[in-house]
Amino acid sequence: MSFEDSLEGLCEKFRILKQQLSDPESLGVQAFVVASREYSDLLPIMSLIEEYQTAQKEIEELEGLINSTDTDAELVHLAREELYTKQKLIPKLKHQLQLSLLPKDKDDSRSAILEIRAGTGGEEAALFVCDLYRMYIKYAERKSWKVEPIGISTTGIGGYKEASLCIGGKDVFARLKFESGVHRVQRVPETESSGRLHTSAATVAVLPEVEEVDLKIDEKDLRIDVYRSSGPGGQSVNTTDSAVRITHIPTGIVVIQQDEKSQHKNKSKALKVLRARLYNLEKQKIEDEISKMRKSQIGSGDRSERIRTYNFLQSRITDHRINMTLYRLEHIMKEGDLDEFVDALIADDQANKLQQISS
């Protein structure tokens, strides 16, 4: 299919979606949600197509004006200048459209659930989980996204064995999905009297948040247990059975939620996480069928696997996937200024996809 045919196909799809959404009663609830999302995703692309096609028409008109024997010399000069500008614009617009035509992750527009867990490194790894958790909250605040803490499991010295949060907003998953993997930290722990450098690790999993209409969970597949929530050391922190443990029997996935005082709120949060994990599990199965070489999302948490290294002594953060190093670790972690990494990772992903299409 040619580039122009691809554009026409998108225009036709947009027309069909617009027609469907003009009569919402003809669609079911789930179909309406899907169509609305697709329509919203196509809007900026349609604007680009319109700009591209308008520029092409203007080039044709300018060329006709220049080649006409009736056009005076001054007008020809102005037309040539305008033609030069428009001809420079066409490749830029075409490149933007080529990027928009790349295979899309249908979950890119969704909100995201982040699950951060301590890997190798004991208490130091747990402290690093705490640092990452705060960094992602700061990043969300910079982007004006909504942050909803889901659950935190603390350690005795203020670290987190694991922490999860939901970050809401448009295209959150698109910008955060490349954070999935093993994050390695190199620093001297405060408890280390000899000043020896320690290496620890934490895993980050980024899951698209799934609405109930996107994934129905059969009640008979769930075992729901309630009990009294407990704090560090196992002491009870609640006199009612507010903590909730949900087991998805077919897959064995277990979600525990006890941060809220209300059993209803804990159950709601646990179901949100369960939906995201089940959706991600099904998505991974499909992707594994397409590419048997695909590795698991977060790895084992071993120090030897890593997507990014945070070296505190050198104030250095290195992303090993794109071989990019920035020397302002404290600013990035405290202020959540991740955009330079995120933008570079997105650009690298797009370049790889373009290369696959052209090869």
From Swiss-Prot:
<keyword id="KW-0963">Cytoplasm</keyword>
<dbReference type="InterPro" id="IPR050057">
    <property type="entry name" value="Prokaryotic/Mito_RF"/>
</dbReference>
<comment type="function">
    <text>Peptide chain release factor 1 directs the termination of translation in response to the peptide chain termination codons UAG and UAA.</text>
</comment>
<dbReference type="InterPro" id="IPR004373">
    <property type="entry name" value="RF-1"/>
</dbReference>
<comment type="similarity">
    <text>Belongs to the prokaryotic/mitochondrial release factor family.</text>
</comment>
<dbReference type="Pfam" id="PF00472">
    <property type="entry name" value="RF-1"/>
</dbReference>
<dbReference type="InterPro" id="IPR005139">
    <property type="entry name" value="PCRF"/>
</dbReference>
<dbReference type="GO" id="GO:0016149">
    <property type="term" value="F:translation release factor activity, codon specific"/>
</dbReference>
<dbReference type="GO" id="GO:0005737">
    <property type="term" value="C:cytoplasm"/>
</dbReference>
<dbReference type="InterPro" id="IPR000352">
    <property type="entry name" value="Pep_chain_release_fac_I"/>
</dbReference>
<feature type="modified residue" description="N5-methylglutamine">
    <location>
        <position position="235"/>
    </location>
</feature>
<dbReference type="Pfam" id="PF03462">
    <property type="entry name" value="PCRF"/>
</dbReference>
<dbReference type="InterPro" id="IPR045853">
    <property type="entry name" value="Pep_chain_release_fac_I_sf"/>
</dbReference>
<keyword id="KW-0648">Protein biosynthesis</keyword>
<keyword id="KW-0488">Methylation</keyword>
<protein>
    <recommendedName>
        <fullName>Peptide chain release factor 1</fullName>
    </recommendedName>
</protein>
